[in-house]
Amino acid sequence: MATYKVQIPASFKTSYSFAESLKVSIAISAFSVKVPCEGAANCNSVRLVNSKEPEKYVSDANAIVSFLYWKQEEDLFNSFISSKLSILDWEALQFTPKAYTAKTKEDFAYLLSQLETIFKENEILNEFTPVEVALASDIYFCVLNGAPVREYPLLSAWYLKIEKQKPFVQALKLTFEKTLGQPAVTSTEKIPVSETTRNVNSQHLMRERVPGEKILPKSNERNILITSALPYVNNVPHLGNIVGSTLSADVFARYHRARNHNTLYICGTDEYGTATETKALEEGVSPKELCDKYHALHKEVYDWFEIDFDHFGRTTTPKQTGIAQHIFTKLYNNDYMAIDTMTQLYCEVHQGYLADRYVEGTCPKCGYDDARGDQCDGCGGLLNAFELIDPKCKLDRATPVKRETKHVFLSLDKLQPAVESWAMQSAVEGKWSNNGRSITESWLKEGLRPRCITRDLKWGTPVPLEEFKGKVLYVWFDATIGYISITANYTDEWEKWWRNPEQVKLYQFMGKDNVPFHTVIFPSSLLGTGEKWTMLHHINTTDYLNYETGKFSKSRGVGVFGNTAQDIGLSPSVWRYYLLSSRPETSDTMFTWKEFITRHNSELLANLGNFVNRTLKFTTAKYNGLVPHYLTDPSVGAGKLKADFVKDVNALLAKYNAALEASKLREGLRLAMEISARGNQYLQDNRIDNKCYLYERQKCADAIGYALNLIYLLAAIFYPYMPSTSTSIYKQLNAPAAAIPDTWELCLLPGHRIGEPEYLFTRIDESMEEEWRSKYGGNGSN
């Protein structure tokens, strides 16, 4: 029979599909017919296929068995036809439909009683004809599903003999191997899933990044350059730092990657400055050793939070020196620099000039007694260190003295007309966040003044002027140039990103305290060179995320920091979800353990987790893990339910895309959860349960088919927010990562095999609130 082959589908051995495959395997073994047999995960039932014309096949197991019997000896087949054909008819028309839906003990008792009657009224042989083949596989199916076969003496006695015969033993082994890819030893085998078992519309997939290939702007595509504020190297980021810049930018970058936009996300540690010098002195190491240590710590934190930079660099590089000095020299030659003598605070104890942030005292504006010399955390106002009441050196608490020193100033007053014209246009075109606009307008309205951009330090980018040898560039002139140099360390073709305003849009994410440096000082520096640069298109800022009753404080042990969040034992997705749903987009927000637990249990678990798990388990139980044959036209079947469902999802999806395009990340997450909730409602509206499956087959298939496709969409739209959760959903669906579409498409097609259902989330016990609050200083002591 070289022109034929048998294909056996993947299935659980407790399924009736497995029993049907076993029929054919017994026939191959018992009738000594040489026909090739192969596993075929892309089919739903056992098939006899014409090898030369594979589109032609028979998928009825009894018909295949009868054909193989006829091929063995035509005379025997004719004799069989006349005497036992009615038993096969009964088996196909009566037994099989009930076997497919059997679930309860009563269901199997009915099947066994019918089989016992067959044995009473007919001569059943101890050898194989098509009838014995069918009965053997039927009884095997009942045994594997826990049916009380021993209570039926005739069929149980016969089965005990037949299951030991060589054809049955060989057939069982063959079916296991072809069905599962390996011999099975328990009743809980998992159906193998792979790309060969997929039936997915491949026109809507997310474009994969090629490992090792540098991302460069492309013509005729959206080229999106994203940065997040460079974290200062010797600070361990707390949750507020993370959501304020790196996590927010990561969501935006992942969204645009999932839209198949050409996207580059750059960040790195800001490593120069007084703070590094002083911290290194405290720890007894060199500044470079300190930076190496903390750069690795930052990278570890961001990796755990699944923040996916295209490149995470640092500012202490030769390229930083070269680019920063180039910009400085251009500004100097263009007469946008001025030299002046200024008075600085000097600590006579450790013999060094003090950067503003290393002078502490009482704020003259609000009376906050822990203000820094550059800014007050109490009122948010910018300060001059000399304005502080009772100033102290942060390092040794000595009272600093005043000393004169010569420095270079950036003439922001000369640059104001250019930067003001640019800012007003960019704020409108780029739809800046409210904080970005208001803070910038406030600075410009007050009038820009020359700002000192050099410091008396050793650790920094050297000032490229001979008379200033021994001085370095001030970190807030130097640090923002780090975005450019970090890109230059990523690719030698960095100018295609940073000198290409016609093709590239620059999006920058940060906390509100960093706004002036990105909307005034950095743009002024670029404009003053007279060269073509990619300028800020959109700035996105956050207010402050506070902790319980106050502020995060590493020194006081208050709050969760990046290197301690993982100790709690929850997945990064749980943290990302809460932080982004509480993102301080328009005002300060508060992290509380009570809300953290409540949102996890009532939103992640009860909404998204429930919908995904319920649908996938139903598909596995009722459809053997295959996407059922649903009607793809939403106007056909199920009245208005399906059409309204599609309409609602598309309306929410449009709002989701609009929110993400505007970098309204919290609103986008809320809409994603609303789409998931609409999926739960759709299942409830269709009353998906065993009764629906048994008596409204097409309605049930439609509902499950659409629900599975909605889960595929949810995996895509949650990818920016909870990438590992989306990866788990893709794995459970056995589907490749999907692009985020403009409108919802049905991409999981009938016959596609899903993977093994798993829980996305598990409940957090409410009692953990007090334990975590106590451990992380949330009792109001701060």
Swiss-Prot record:
It catalyses: tRNA(Met) + L-methionine + ATP = L-methionyl-tRNA(Met) + AMP + diphosphate. Coiled coil: none annotated. GO terms for biological process: cytoplasmic translation; methionyl-tRNA aminoacylation. Pfam families: Anticodon_3, tRNA-synt_1g. Keywords: Aminoacyl-tRNA synthetase, ATP-binding, Cytoplasm, Ligase, Nucleotide-binding, Protein biosynthesis. InterPro entries: aa-tRNA-synth_I_CS (IPR001412), Anticodon_Met (IPR041872), Met-tRNA_ligase_1 (IPR023458), Met-tRNA_synth (IPR014758), Methionyl/Leucyl_tRNA_Synth (IPR015413), MetRS_core (IPR033911), MetRS_Zn (IPR029038), Rossmann-like_a/b/a_fold (IPR014729). PROSITE patterns: AA_TRNA_LIGASE_I (PS00178). GO terms for cellular component: aminoacyl-tRNA synthetase multienzyme complex; cytoplasmic stress granule; cytosol; methionyl glutamyl tRNA synthetase complex. A motif ('KMSKS' region) lies at residues 551-555. A motif ('HIGH' region) lies at residues 231-241. Its EC number is 6.1.1.10. It is found in: Cytoplasm. GO terms for molecular function: ATP binding; methionine-tRNA ligase activity. Its main location: cytoplasm. HAMAP family: Met_tRNA_synth_type1 (MF_00098). Belongs to the class-I aminoacyl-tRNA synthetase family. This is Probable methionine--tRNA ligase, cytoplasmic.
